[in-house]
Amino acid sequence: MLYICNKRRLFMSNYLFTSESVSEGHPDKVADQISDAILDAILEQDPQARVACETLVTTGMALIAGEITTSAWVDMPEVVRNTIKEIGYNSSEMGFDWQSCAVMTTIDKQSPDIAQGVNEGAGIDLDQGAGDQGLMFGYASNETDVLMPMPITLAHRLTRRQAQVRKSSILPWLRPDAKSQVTIEYENKIPKRIDAVVLSTQHDESISYNDLKEAVMEEIIKPTLPADMIDANTKFFINPTGRFVIGGPVGDCGLTGRKIIVDTYGGKALHGGGAFSGKDPSKVDRSSAYYGRYVAKNLVAAGIASELQIQVAYAIGIAQPVSINVNSFGTGRISDAAIKELILGNFDLRPKAIVQQLDLLRPIYRQTAAYGHFGRSDVEFPWERTDKIEELKSAAGL
């Protein structure tokens, strides 16, 4: 009997996996939201605009730079200030606020050498080509109802809840900057329990550390995390330095595109390195990553695999991908090669087709720029649709 128990244990695989999220008031996320707010303002007037907008935020200043080709006119300082105001930096006591911060802009046009590879009817490939070379990943897993990894899903819920209780004045001493981190214990690839939770939230001077810890536990952590995943051994770290008054762009310089793992799958899937925010959908860094999620999510929702990762790579100016790779991590009901054929037969991976299928030439990007681009339950994104399930089941013979 002892031998049998030991043998069973030998084949069981327990491990920990951790993902983090940051709030909308985190300096890098402030930058992302400003870049995407500018993108939305331009797309509202000119859906065919080419936008690559980068933002830097620091004490008392926001700097906007990049390459933009458009017929639209946008009051960028106004967009920047409104975004900062909506996030919640509304007092000079924070060292960064929407009324007094300086807004500087330095914008050029898109390079014509790049444009001829992207414009339909121009360049060597007359179809609309990829805006750059690169590799993008899409991923889905059935371990949560939104078909996302559990660690990043719960981490995002914590930072969203922090913003809710701050903006509704349930905890009026909270400030916009916050970070969360969730560690899940897996057994044979199945989430079993929450092993550790870290939540650091900016606050004003009025709250004591003990009162803050109690309030964060009762108003943010307990209402957010599933009680059946928490046990006596779950560890909680609430503002573990003891103080977090200085935060936001005063505490750290923020830049667009520095939270690419927070934006995607929390490290559970691979990442090609390209950021999303501030880029119009002709940039495959963004549109192909969204489409990769759409492909993977539909395949998992169809029951073809319980976990799936797809890699797609492009050459600048060329419409068709140069490579496609599929990994079902041994969970596929058909082979990875067969899944690849399903993808090629049921999804069009050319940049123009992606934009058309997902209807991406719309001002929908500001809302992607905090709390993750994938697996959202608070907003509806076209790449989260599961409208290919029956088609894929039929094609797979399931």
From Swiss-Prot:
PROSITE patterns: ADOMET_SYNTHASE_1, ADOMET_SYNTHASE_2
Main location group: cytoplasm
Reactions this protein catalyses: L-methionine + ATP + H2O = S-adenosyl-L-methionine + phosphate + diphosphate
Co-factor: note: Binds 2 divalent ions per subunit. Binds 1 potassium ion per subunit.
Residue sites binding Mg(2+) per the record: 28
Alphabetical list of Pfam families matching this protein: S-AdoMet_synt_C, S-AdoMet_synt_M, S-AdoMet_synt_N
Any one cellular-component term (Gene Ontology): cytoplasm
Sites where the protein binds K(+): 54
NCBIfam families documented for this protein: metK
Protein's UniProt name: S-adenosylmethionine synthase
Highest classification ranks of the organism: Bacteria, Pseudomonadati, Thermodesulfobacteriota, Desulfobulbia, Desulfobulbales
